[in-house]
Amino acid sequence: ARECPGKQEWPELVGEYGYKAAAIIERENPNVRSIVKHERSGFTKDFRCDRVWVVVDSTGVVVRTPRVT
C-alpha cells in the first residue's frame, strides 16, 4: 500500500459543488492540491500523494469520491 500523509478520501463530498469540495479537501489535507475536472476529461494514470481529482458533472457537482490519486 502507498503511504501518503493526511486524509486520503472524501466520500462525504459527493453531491457537493466541485470548487467548494476542492477547498474543503485542501483545508483538511494541506499536503494535497485538489484539481476539479469534468468526468469526461482525460486523467493521468500516475499515482501522486499530492493530488486529488475532484470529478464533476456538467452542473459542477462532484460525482465520484475524491481521493488521493
UniProtKB/Swiss-Prot annotation:
InterPro entries: Prot_inh_pot1, Prot_inh_pot1_sf. GO terms for molecular function: serine-type endopeptidase inhibitor activity. Keywords: Disulfide bond, Protease inhibitor, Serine protease inhibitor. The keyword Disulfide bond applies. The record marks 45-46 as: Reactive bond. Signal peptide: none annotated. The keyword Lipid metabolism does not apply. One of its GO terms (biological process) is response to wounding. It comes from the Eukaryota. Disulfide bonds join 4-49. Belongs to the protease inhibitor I13 (potato type I serine protease inhibitor) family. Inhibitor of trypsin, chymotrypsin, subtilisin, etc. This is Trypsin/subtilisin inhibitor. It comes from Amaranthus caudatus.
